[in-house]
């Protein structure tokens, strides 16, 4: 079994890896891929980690707030790996920025800046001190009735009324077609969703990797790993080697549910190469 974690180049990712290991993954089964890394080949699961903001141009908007911190290389990486996961039939789990990227890739939109565009009395960016504890509670999550009886949906329902951490200033505005909300914050911002049927695709807006010592939070990673193991077993571990279609490395072009998204990401990458986002970005890394 091979699980790929998509992450920023400068972002410490030991927390995400540690959460997967705590849930039962083996060290050799987890591979971290950052912008510019070689083609990871075929894989059995994809975890889209936190990071900088998703570019508004990818969901049809012009940048409208000075608080944006963009990382076009990461946008291109996430959408390419997500496309590969769709082609492979591999489970996908998004966390914070990962939730936002999945929503955009499937046709949804985002609030560019919650404090200025959607202030409703709940702070979603509580970790303003880089030395603050990453498990600091911000607000509770409210589970929503879901048609799915999936293991992931059950894990989210079990978190009803639980306090979670929060380190983001963007959020889901229009949920993409085919996605079902599983939980929301007290101000009704979507905090978790999944795509029922057609394989495992799920995401949360908070950072459960910092809360994995809590049994109910670890259950989210266990549900993801269970789906990854099923995929690996069905494919004889990792299936055929993945051949990217037109570009070298992880910036491969594979057909997206929303094809214009990757084209825009790649155009943004070539037009504005720039350095990776700093570690103090809007979705503060672990």
Regions found by a protein language model. Name each.
Residues 99:
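The feature captures the ABC ATPase H-loop/switch
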Residues 202-205:
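Active-site-proximal beta-strand elements of phosphoester/diester hydrolases
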């Amino acid at each position: 079994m091979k699980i790929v974690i998509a992450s920023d180049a400068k972002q410490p990712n030991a927390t995400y890896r540690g959460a997967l290991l705590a849930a039962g993954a083996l060290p050799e089964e987890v591979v971290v891929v950052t912008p510019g890394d070689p083609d990871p080949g075929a894989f059995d699961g994809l975890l889209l980690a936190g990071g900088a903001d998703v570019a508004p141009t990818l969901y049809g908007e012009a940048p409208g707030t000075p608080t944006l911190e963009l990382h076009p290389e990461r946008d291109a990486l996430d959408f390419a790996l997500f496309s590969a996961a769709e082609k492979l039939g591999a489970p996908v789990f998004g966390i914070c920025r990962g939730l936002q990227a999945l929503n955009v890739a499937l046709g949804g939109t985002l609030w560019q800046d919650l404090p200025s565009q959607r202030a409703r009395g709940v702070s979603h960016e509580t970790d303003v001190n880089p030395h603050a504890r990453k498990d600091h509670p911000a607000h509770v999550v409210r589970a929503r009735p879901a048609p799915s009886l999936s293991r992931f949906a059950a894990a989210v329902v079990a978190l009803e009324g639980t306090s979670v951490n929060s380190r983001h200033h963007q959020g889901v505005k229009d949920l993409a077609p085919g996605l079902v909300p599983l939980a929301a914050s007290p101000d009704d911002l979507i905090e978790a969703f999944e795509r029922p049927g057609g394989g495992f695709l799920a995401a949360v807006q908070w950072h459960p990797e910092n809360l994995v010592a809590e049994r109910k939070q670890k259950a989210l990673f266990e549900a993801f790993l269970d789906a990854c193991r099923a995929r690996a077993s069905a494919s004889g571990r990792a299936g055929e080697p993945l051949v990217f279609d037109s570009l070298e490395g992880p910036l491969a072009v594979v057909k997206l549910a929303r094809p214009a998204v990757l084209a825009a990401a790649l155009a943004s990458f070539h037009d504005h190469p720039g350095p990776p986002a700093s570690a103090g970005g809007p979705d503060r890394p672990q």
